[in-house]
Amino acid sequence: SSKWEACCDRCACTKSIPPQCHCADIRLNSCHSACESCACTRSIPAKCRCFDITDFCYKPCSG
């Protein structure tokens, strides 16, 4: 699978309905392709994390 495809290994959801899920993965230089709210450190390489809240988890990246 493409490394740019949206995926997440460490996803956490609340038990509410609908659930509120977020991905805790740290990626180098960019967030996954579906991320709208991405924050990166200024280090080289940059460590980026997606802060989107969704009602689902993306499929795992490592498979």
Swiss-Prot record:
Signal peptide: none annotated. Disulfide bonds join 7-61, 8-23, 11-57, 13-21, 31-38, 35-50, 40-48. SUPFAM superfamilies: Bowman-Birk inhibitor, BBI (SSF57247). The record marks 41-42 as: Reactive bond for chymotrypsin. The record marks 14-15 as: Reactive bond for trypsin. GO terms for cellular component: extracellular region. CDD domains: BBI. Transmembrane segments: none annotated. SMART domains: BowB (SM00269). GO terms for molecular function: serine-type endopeptidase inhibitor activity. InterPro entries: Bowman-Birk_prot_inh (IPR035995), Prot_inh_BBI (IPR000877). Gene3D superfamilies: Cysteine Protease (Bromelain) Inhibitor, subunit H (2.10.69.10). Keywords: Disulfide bond, Protease inhibitor, Serine protease inhibitor. It holds the Pfam family Bowman-Birk_leg. PROSITE patterns: BOWMAN_BIRK. Inhibits trypsin, chymotrypsin, plasmin and factor XIIa. Does not inhibit factor Xa, thrombin and plasma kallikrein. Belongs to the Bowman-Birk serine protease inhibitor family. This is Bowman-birk type proteinase inhibitor.
